[in-house]
């Protein structure tokens, strides 16, 4: 094992392992981005829009996001949520405004995305690190929605089955029923840079190399997501906010609930050139990803990413990396419902006597 490891996705700087492990203090919020009709798109991700906000690398932004649930029918959000006893003053005004004024493009997807955020200095071949400092629910309720064509069992239900679920944010649980409570673990289902120029515009439904709808429930506060950059400025979008979701997201949705995210954006020059897929990290694990229409192919990709990571970052031989992946790395299904499916690998940091310092202890 090397004595000093490169910071994950090397930036040309080495970080000594003797540095104290204390987490960095919460950064100052440099800008805010509200989810208004002029700062959101509905159902797609594109490299062909002017920035909703321009920032410098290292800056932190407080971003409002809006769930699409309650915005997809003929009735407006206030009427939709009133059916479950949600008072009108608890329905977000920006959700009502978006429903009334933002057009949906036929054939694309359902997600309302805030952005794009243009990060100065980001260029193709770089890597954008998104540090998730805080995720705060904006409403005390969420929606799980399924139906006859939804999820991994599309023939199971004969009728749409929307379920509006109250959230107890003081106790940090979702009140699924009188005798079932689910611990909350908010995260953003979609975090994405703009796709490559040869693609230009994509539906927000399938995840891919630029991130997108990865529905990865490990991306809670205290985690980092690493995305390859394909365009000048990176052009970051986010949305599809979740209060909690299990691996697989098997009926097609989580508890979908609007939230405010505090995110820090850091450009790592040249570090995206060799990236095949996004990666992630938290205080306890490194995460690799594989995506494909075929879950078996996604599994092979996630395994290959894991082997490559262990070789590149820890100096293992191919044989040892493959062996370690088999005996110590768990592979799980992040989501199996977005046409393109995603497998992730969990590499425990505790396997290694020495690992680089991470910014968060959570």
Regions found by a protein language model. Name each.
Residues 68-80, 135-145, 233-243, 334-337:
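Short, Lys/Arg- and Gly-enriched loop/turn segments at beta-strand edges
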Residues 339-362:
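Long, compositionally biased
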Residues 1-10:
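Bacterial N-terminal signal peptides that target proteins for export
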């Amino acid at each position: 094992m090397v004595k000093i490891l490169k910071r994950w996705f090397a930036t040309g700087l080495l970080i000594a392992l003797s540095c104290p492990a204390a987490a960095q203090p919460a950064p100052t919020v440099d800008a805010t981005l509200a989810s208004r009709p002029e700062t959101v798109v509905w159902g797609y991700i594109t490299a062909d829009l002017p920035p909703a906000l321009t920032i410098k690398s290292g800056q932190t932004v407080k971003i409002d996001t809006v769930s699409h649930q309650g915005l997809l029918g003929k009735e407006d959000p206030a009427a939709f949520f009133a059916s479950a006893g949600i008072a009108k003053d608890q329905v977000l005004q920006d959700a009502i405004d978006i429903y009334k004024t933002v057009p949906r493009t036929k054939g694309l997807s359902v997600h309302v995305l805030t952005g794009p955020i243009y990060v100065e200095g980001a260029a193709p071949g770089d890597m954008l690190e998104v540090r998730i400092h805080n995720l705060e629910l904006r409403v005390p309720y969420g929606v799980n929605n399924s139906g006859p064509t939804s999820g991994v069992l599309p023939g199971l239900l004969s009728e749409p089955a929307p379920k509006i679920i109250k959230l107890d944010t003081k106790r940090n649980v979702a009140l699924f029923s009188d005798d079932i409570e689910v611990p909350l673990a908010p995260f953003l289902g979609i975090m994405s840079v703009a796709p490559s120029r040869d693609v230009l515009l994509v539906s927000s439904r399938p995840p891919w190399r630029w991130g997108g709808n990865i529905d990865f429930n490990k991306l809670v506060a205290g985690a980092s997501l690493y995305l390859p950059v394909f365009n000048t400025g990176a052009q970051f979008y986010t949305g599809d906010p979740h209060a909690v979701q299990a691996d697989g997201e098997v009926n097609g949705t989580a508890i979908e609930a609007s939230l405010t995210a505090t995110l820090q954006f850091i450009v790592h020059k040249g570090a995206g050139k060799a990236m095949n897929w996004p990666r992630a990290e938290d205080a306890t694990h490194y995460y690799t990803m594989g995506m494909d229409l075929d879950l078996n192919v996604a599994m092979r990709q996630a395994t290959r990413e894991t082997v490559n990571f262990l070789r590149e970052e820890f100096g293992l031989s191919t044989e040892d990396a493959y062996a370690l992946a088999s005996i110590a790395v768990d592979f799980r299904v992040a989501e199996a419902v977005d046409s393109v499916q995603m497998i992730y690998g969990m590499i425990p940091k505790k396997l290694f006597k020495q690992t680089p310092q991470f910014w968060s202890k959570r």
